[in-house]
């Protein structure tokens, strides 16, 4: 078994082994010279190992052989004549064998070769080739790694195109930055290709396709919330169209515009259509006319200009309703007498003692009885005075508005004196007071009707 193994070993190794075991005096010098020769040759030696030497199983066999030979050396050492020379030669041989073994350890770690101190020199010859190839491979790996790391660095810094991952810039293919996400795109890489006009215009703020989609979605989301309460507003508007809801709103507007006493009991529609029966008239007049009477007294004390304004407003307000035909001629005749006969100027000049006199009859006007008697007197006047409006116009009638004493002259004086005697006996108000108040009320009612119609038209629109 040992002979077969010896045939496969290196001849230089066998020669050195023979010198080691020899008992001659020159063996140590020859061994040293052989070691120097082998070191000088090194890789350039003519010996080339076969594949058998490199294979791991045969390496293990050589190891077993060297293990067998070691006891032989130890046994032969005491028998030698020159022990010191042999020991030095043995040390040199071991050092020479350890040097290539150390080199092979570094190279053969990747090939799973068991580590042993004694390995052949042929393996050291094959090792530089493997080292060179590994160097070449490592250089290639480093260059590729540098390229990839540069690309990654450019991508991390945001210097390269997001689509093609390159930093190249041409005349018609420049890098454009999205102002929202700050990604760079080539003009050709971006799906809707970016035109040169968009790139060169400094005023333009460019967004990529993804950001534009997101911004559109956000805009739609922000527009939707204000659209949701819109149906609630629409649902409120049909309730306004309801006639029951209209009335309080229009009444509030009337109170604020005319600045009368704030009473929600005022129902001008019932007052207008209330002359069909005397009971309805009296009940409506007591509640509604008390506030308007005080307001009319204030306006009548201002002078004849207010009467003229009321007559003008009454003429321009619109058509009279059929249900209120009994009252309206009274107001018209009263206004005609006051405007044509110039009675307002007479009242202001001769009959009124002081400007504070018209305020005195206000407390009795608020009583319910006075309202009843006034409504009755108005009905009497309307019944009596309707056939003779022409006689009232030319006839000069002198009337006192403040003191409560009244006297009428003219062809129809006997008919109107009855009504005035009733009113003067029951209250301190004159006949002129109710007729002027009625005319003002009629004018105000017509204005209210016109305003109601205008408000209804607006709501319908």
UniProtKB/Swiss-Prot annotation:
GO biological process: RNA polymerase II transcription initiation surveillance; snRNA processing
Superkingdom as given in the UniProt entry: Eukaryota
Phosphoserine: residues carrying this PTM: 127
Annotated Polar residues bias: 302-328
Keywords: Isopeptide bond, Metal-binding, Nucleus, Phosphoprotein, Ubl conjugation, Zinc, Zinc-finger
CDD domains noted in UniProt: PHD_Int12
Protein name according to UniProt: Integrator complex subunit 12
MF terms (GO), sorted A to Z: zinc ion binding
Family: Belongs to the Integrator subunit 12 family.
Subunit-level organization: Component of the Integrator complex, composed of core subunits INTS1, INTS2, INTS3, INTS4, INTS5, INTS6, INTS7, INTS8, INTS9/RC74, INTS10, INTS11/CPSF3L, INTS12, INTS13, INTS14 and INTS15. The core complex associates with protein phosphatase 2A subunits PPP2CA and PPP2R1A, to form the Integrator-PP2A (INTAC) complex.
Biological role: Component of the integrator complex, a multiprotein complex that terminates RNA polymerase II (Pol II) transcription in the promoter-proximal region of genes.
Crosslink feature (Glycyl lysine isopeptide (Lys-Gly) (interchain with G-Cter in SUMO2)) location: 68, 253
Organism the protein comes from: Mus musculus (Mouse)
Subcellular location, record wording: Nucleus
Chain intervals with Low complexity compositional bias: 348-357, 381-436
Main location: nucleus
Any one GO cellular component localisation term in the record: INTAC complex
């Amino acid at each position: 078994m040992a002979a077969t193994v010896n045939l496969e070993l290196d001849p230089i190794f066998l020669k050195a082994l023979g010198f080691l075991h020899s008992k001659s005096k020159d063996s140590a010098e020859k061994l040293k010279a052989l070691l120097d020769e082998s070191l000088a040759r090194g890789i350039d030696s003519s010996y080339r190992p076969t594949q058998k030497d490199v294979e791991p199983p045969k390496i293990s066999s050589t190891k077993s052989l060297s293990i067998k030979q070691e006891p032989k050396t130890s046994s032969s050492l005491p028998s030698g004549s020159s022990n010191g020379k042999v020991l030095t030669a043995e040390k040199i041989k071991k050092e020479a064998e350890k040097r290539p073994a150390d080199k092979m350890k570094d190279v053969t770690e990747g090939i799973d070769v068991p580590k042993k101190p004694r390995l052949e020199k042929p393996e050291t010859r094959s090792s530089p080739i493997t080292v060179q190839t590994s160097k070449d491979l490592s250089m290639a790996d480093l260059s590729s790694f540098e390229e990839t790391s540069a690309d990654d660095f450019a991508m991390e810094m945001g210097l390269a195109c997001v689509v093609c991952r390159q930093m190249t810039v041409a005349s018609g293919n420049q890098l454009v930055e999205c102002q929202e996400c700050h990604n760079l795109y080539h003009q050709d890489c971006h799906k809707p290709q970016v035109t040169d006009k968009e790139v060169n215009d400094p005023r333009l703020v460019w967004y990529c396709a993804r950001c534009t989609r997101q911004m559109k979605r956000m805009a739609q989301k922000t527009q939707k919330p204000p659209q949701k309460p819109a149906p609630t507003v629409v649902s409120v508007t049909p309730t306004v169209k309801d006639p029951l809801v209209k009335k309080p709103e229009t009444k509030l507007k009337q109170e604020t515009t005319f600045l009368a006493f704030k009473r929600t009991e005022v129902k001008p529609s019932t007052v207008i259509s209330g002359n069909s029966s005397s009971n309805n008239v009296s009940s409506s007049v007591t509640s509604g006319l008390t506030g308007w009477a005080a307001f009319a007294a204030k306006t009548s004390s201002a002078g004849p200009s207010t009467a003229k304004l009321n007559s003008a407003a009454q003429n321009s307000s619109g058509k009279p309703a059929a249900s209120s035909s009994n009252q309206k001629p009274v107001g018209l005749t009263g206004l005609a007498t006051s405007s044509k006969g110039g009675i307002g100027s007479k009242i202001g000049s001769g009959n009124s003692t002081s400007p504070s006199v018209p305020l005195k009859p206000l407390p009795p006007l608020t009583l319910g009885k006075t309202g009843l008697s006034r409504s009755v007197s108005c009905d009497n006047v309307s019944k009596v005075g309707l056939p003779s409006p022409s006689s009232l116009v030319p006839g000069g009638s002198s009337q006192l508005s403040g003191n409560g004493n009244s006297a009428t002259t003219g062809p129809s004086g006997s008919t109107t004196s009855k009504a005035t005697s009733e009113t003067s006996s029951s209250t301190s108000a004159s006949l002129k007071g109710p007729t002027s108040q009625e005319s003002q009320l009629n004018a105000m009612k017509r204005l209210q009707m016109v305003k109601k119609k205008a408000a209804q038209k607006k709501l319908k629109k």
